[in-house]
Curated annotation (Swiss-Prot):
Nucleotide-binding recorded as keyword: yes
Keywords from the UniProt entry: Cell membrane, GTP-binding, Hydrolase, Lipoprotein, Membrane, Methylation, Nucleotide-binding, Prenylation
Organism from which the protein derives: Dictyostelium discoideum
Propeptide: 195-197
Protein's name in the database: Ras-like protein rasB
Activity control mechanisms: Alternates between an inactive form bound to GDP and an active form bound to GTP. Activated by a guanine nucleotide-exchange factor (GEF) and inactivated by a GTPase-activating protein (GAP).
InterPro entries per the UniProt record, alphabetical: P-loop_NTPase (IPR027417), Small_GTP-bd (IPR005225), Small_GTPase (IPR001806), Small_GTPase_Ras-type (IPR020849)
Family to which this protein belongs: Belongs to the small GTPase superfamily. Ras family.
GO MF, one example: G protein activity
Motif (Effector region): 35-43
Length: 197
């Protein structure tokens, strides 16, 4: 089985939302019970996404509040992002706007491949964020949305595969426009770049 594509995925979100639990469940098929704050961990997994054999290079990052100096660097190198919040934490859900804005600022592109992930959906009795709220936020961002449970292994593979699909989709879009620093749109015309303000 030869690998045709390699993708760099970055898992982002607040501290304690289950980024490491999701990533380790995806890579090693087991659930980590104890919370040990991550600085930065990198994992690789070869897998089949639709018809393609892919090598996923996954960066499990520190929570939003920690280690912000490294954040811009891994946002620059990432191709696709899982923006994870905890359905039992309204605060982590509200932080997602900031996470997305940081990604868009660093990538200088508002069409970055992102999947919104509401983790810990097995803790229904502690839920603070409804599935409908997650779905509405994803719709406002124009990104896919999944609720997951790292503990029960619900939608774990699917959320990573969905990011790969979003990356593939973005790579197929010809001449995607990019916002410049002043808010204009750069478009390719014969003879060079033009700035439309």
């Amino acid at each position: 089985m030869s690998v045709s594509n390699e993708y760099k995925l970055v898992v982002m979100g607040g501290g304690g939302v289950g980024k490491s639990a999701l990533t380790i469940q995806f890579i090693q098929n087991h659930f980590i019970e104890e919370y040990d704050p991550t600085i930065e961990d990198s994992y690789r997994r070869q897998c089949q996404v639709d018809e393609d054999t892919c090598l996923l290079d996954i960066l499990d990052t520190a929570g939003q509040d920690d280690y912000s100096a490294m954040r811009d660097q891994y946002m620059r190198t990432g191709q696709g992002f899982l923006c994870v919040y905890d359905v039992t934490s309204r605060t982590s859900f509200e932080e997602i706007n900031v996470v997305r804005e940081q990604i868009i600022r660093v990538k200088d592109n508002d069409k970055v491949p992102i999947v919104l992930v509401g983790n810990k959906c097995d803790l229904e009795n502690l839920r603070e964020v409804t599935e409908g709220e997650g779905s509405e936020l994803a719709k406002s961002f124009s990104v896919p949305f999944l609720e997951t449970s790292a503990k029960k292994r619900l939608n774990v593979d699917e959320c990573f595969f969905e990011v790969v699909r979003e990356i593939k989709k973005s790579l197929k879009e010809p001449g995607r426009s990019k916002k410049d620093k002043k808010g204009g749109i750069l478009k390719k015309f014969k003879g060079g770049d033009c700035l439309i303000l």
